[in-house]
Amino acid sequence: MKKVVIDGNNLTIEDVVKVARDKWEVVLSEVAKERIVHSREIVDRYVKEGKVVYGITTGFGKFSDVVISKEDTEALQKNLIMSHSCAVGDPLPEEVVRAIMLLRANALAKGFSGVRLETVETLIEMINKNVVPVIPEKGSLGASGDLAPLAHMVLVMIGRGEAFYAGERVSGEEAMRRAGIPTITLSSKEGLALINGTQVMSALGCLNVYDAKRIIAVADAVASITLEALRGIIDAFDDRVQMVRPHKGQIVSAKNVRKMVEGSELITRQGEIRVQDAYTLRCIPQVHGAVRDAISYIERVLGVEINSATDNPLIFPDDGEVISGGNFHGEPVALAMDFLSIALSEIANISERRIERLVNYQLNDLPPFLTEKGGLNSGMMIAQYTAASLVSENKVLSHPASVDSIPSSANQEDHVSMGTIAARKAREVLKNVTTVLAIELLTASQALEFRKGFKRGKGTDRIYRLVREKVNPLVEDRELYIDINACFDIIRSGRIEEVLKEEGIMLE
């Protein structure tokens, strides 16, 4: 079994994907175990001495001024989980929940949360035995962290709630019993430590940014096919043009396109057919590149967040102190996820306009809507409608969630991030972008049917042939949703990158 070792400091987004999607085993490092035990000693001492510490011997939120007796500290934590299990909506996908559990375990592994070692080990065992809590997708304000959804995760740990196990939705108690995992009784501070963090938005964020990195490379490849089908001008992709405005993403996108069309007889030079192309072709490096740079920034934000202690209060065992702070506030992730939605929407925006240039005979020398029997057949006409619909939907979804805030807990928690809403929206935007690119891939491949007799580029030809393995050329009208879905699957499966790699073309 392949393993990911967590220590609270070195988890990567790639590690998250390995655990979430590929079901790699999670192992807690020995150093992390020592830190967890050391941190727990401070909590036990404070409880024994009867010190007043938020979340350990007090209530929560506006009830932080209510002192809880030593005898009631365990009941306090159980009540916290029960009362906070208020999330609603459809269950989050399994891959997201597995990522959530991994990120929470990694945050606890830093040793600033004061939980018992057995509690962290229970969470890890649930990951390894694929006990997946049913976590409804809606209900988080993104500060204090993802309280409501994370409470549903903890319900299963204490033998309540619901979970998916072995393909069935069962009670949390049954899932734990069938997996052979003992349920736990929460001790002082543990309920709070398990739910007061940004792990839901961060889990969504990690999967979003991982997929976005793939999509931007695919967008370069798909745009290259359109460039070729429209006999675009390669001069705009010259490295010298990029180097006098040396944004890294722009340089990479131009390089990717040059790789794709190498050897093409369809690609033209400036002045050969046209002096210059429309912006949707000529500015591919500038637009795609800016999105690539945005994704790199977002990746850095998440890289910090997934290796952070995000609960409250924090235990500093070396100093013997417990400090209340605000690391649960999801603003860094909220802004990053809103940025991701905006950036990805631009990929769909420019892709849809390239689709229009492919189907609009007034903008090219191809048959209207890429069908030879126009009138009797509508060809690719309505595929562009679908792309336009998705682009417009993305414009709504890209309205930032982070600009909103509603005070809660009797105005004690008077500013929140809405980071999980931002992350959920970004996931939907990503699906729409992938579909728009699938429509462009389908449409550009159809356009190439009218460019017979010209040699295609090394990369574009390979992808064209990949499409034709799944989708026949459009001769007469048929149900295009089948073709769109086939191209969507080609993109999502990673086959584009695989076949290009076989040709020695490595997209960055």
UniProtKB/Swiss-Prot annotation:
GO annotations under biological process?
Answer: L-histidine catabolic process to glutamate and formamide; L-histidine catabolic process to glutamate and formate
Annotated positions of the 2,3-didehydroalanine (Ser) modification: 144
PTM remark: Contains an active site 4-methylidene-imidazol-5-one (MIO), which is formed autocatalytically by cyclization and dehydration of residues Ala-Ser-Gly.
What EC class does the entry list?
Answer: lyase
Which Pfam families does this chain map to? Lyase_aromatic (PF00221)
Reaction equations catalysed:
L-histidine = trans-urocanate + NH4(+)
SUPFAM superfamilies from the UniProt entry: L-aspartase-like (SSF48557)
Keyword list, A-Z: Cytoplasm, Histidine metabolism, Lyase
InterPro entries under this entry? Aromatic_Lyase, Fumarase/histidase_N, HutH, L-Aspartase-like, Phe/His_NH3-lyase_AS
Pathway(s) the chain acts in: Amino-acid degradation; L-histidine degradation into L-glutamate; N-formimidoyl-L-glutamate from L-histidine: step 1/3
Question: What is this protein's record name?
Answer: Histidine ammonia-lyase
Which species does this protein come from? Caldanaerobacter subterraneus subsp. tengcongensis (strain DSM 15242 / JCM 11007 / NBRC 100824 / MB4) (Thermoanaerobacter tengcongensis)
